[in-house]
Regions:
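Conserved glycine-rich acetyl-CoA-binding loop
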Residues: 101-115, 122-124, 128, 134-142, ...
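Short acidic/glycine-enriched loop/turn segments that link adjacent beta-strands
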Residues: 17, 91, 137, 159-166
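Short Asp/Glu-rich motifs
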Residues: 56-59, 140, 163-164
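Conserved catalytic-core motifs of GNAT/GCN5-like acyltransferases
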Residues: 2, 7, 130-132, 145, ...
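Conserved beta-strand edge residues that scaffold enzyme active sites
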Residues: 47, 51, 135-136, 158-159
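Acetyl-CoA-dependent GNAT
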Residues: 2-16, 21-105, 111-116, 120, ...
Length: 187
């Protein structure tokens, strides 16, 4: 089923795909984004960071893509349940942030966001998706692996920790087929 942006969406945890849609984030979505960011992460991005990113959305190399996942749960009204932030590069996209509200984690929202990201990247002409994930975040790493991302490197002391230290990041990549059907080889 199409979600209005031309991309296919699968059902959400057994619910009709019509209960799910995506939209580009705007400054008017800042409260919802920050609520999710603060609930999902012990060290959330700042409002200033999101303001800067939202003002630089576009389709050129170096621009950002910020997409919101709207969902209508079985009981309740439609609301933003998650989002991703990605940066466009030459034939690549870099996932910078993916967050799902804790009340909607483990319900397939991350996979829907990743599916939408992959569709976006392929529509843009990307051949590879990149991301970094905390070494300690095994749950996220498993979600990324299940989606097809492979670990390719480690960034030492990449993330700050709540205790004031630093934590390594696993670098993961997902190779995408080109319009001609061929796929790059892993690094």
């Amino acid at each position: 089923m199409a979600n209005g942006s031309g991309f296919a969406v699968t059902a959400w945890q057994g619910h009709d795909a019509a209960a799910v849609r995506f939209s580009a984030a705007t400054m008017g979505d800042m409260d919802a984004i920050m609520d999710i960011e603060r609930a999902a992460y012990p060290l959330p991005w700042s409002c200033d960071s999101f303001t800067s990113i939202l003002s630089r959305q576009g389709l050129q190399c170096g621009d950002y893509v910020v997409q919101l996942l709207w969902a209508r749960p079985p009981v309740g009204t439609e609301a933003v349940q998650g989002y991703f932030v990605a940066m466009l590069g030459f034939e690549e996209m870099h996932l910078l942030n993916l967050a799902v509200h804790p009340d909607f984690q483990a319900k397939g929202c991350s996979l829907l966001l990743l599916q939408h990201l992959r569709n976006w990247a392929q529509g843009y002409g990307a051949r590879v998706l990149w991301l970094e994930v905390r070494e300690s975040n095994r749950r996220a790493q498993e979600i990324y692996r299940r989606f097809g991302f492979l670990p390719v490197a480690m960034r030492k002391h990449y993330y700050p920790t709540p205790e004031g230290g630093r934590e390594h990041a696993a670098v993961m990549q997902l190779l995408l087929p080109s319009p001609g059907g061929d796929t790059l080889r892993p690094v």
